[in-house]
Amino acid sequence: MHILMKCLGNKINDFNHKRVNDYIKDKLEIKDVLFRGLTIEEVLSYKFEVNKRIKFKRITSFSSESHIAETFAAERYMTNVLIVLKNANIFDYSTAMIEILENLIAIEESGQTDDDKLNKLYDNLSIVDYEREFLLPISSELTVKNIYFDNKKNMHIIEME
């Protein structure tokens, strides 16, 4: 099984964080703007301040779709805190996983397989494509550039580079 499959759905353990990090660290690209809804643990532990450098302790996911991150911030984590990340060196998880899943689907469709397994692959493909996820490697350092409240979104925004 490909190591990136460990990232589907659930949080991965520390051992797999290192394995995924080893895989992605040499496959980074610059992405203009990405978004992340923050958990309460992240809000409390990182203590965001303008000009402060923050080192992320584990692989951290971002989306290229602001509405995805806003939904996580407001509905799942209930923090209403959003990171807007600019010009980051990051791994394009969605594109890599779409390729892996499409290859698995092709293999399954060419042989005898049960519908449940194939349906699960299609479900995962749909989720990965929808979330447009990117992964920031372990120990990445970013600088807080600005913090403000966006009344229209009802979100605290933390701009980082």
Task: Please state what every model-predicted region is.
Residues 1-161:
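Mono-ADP-ribosyltransferase
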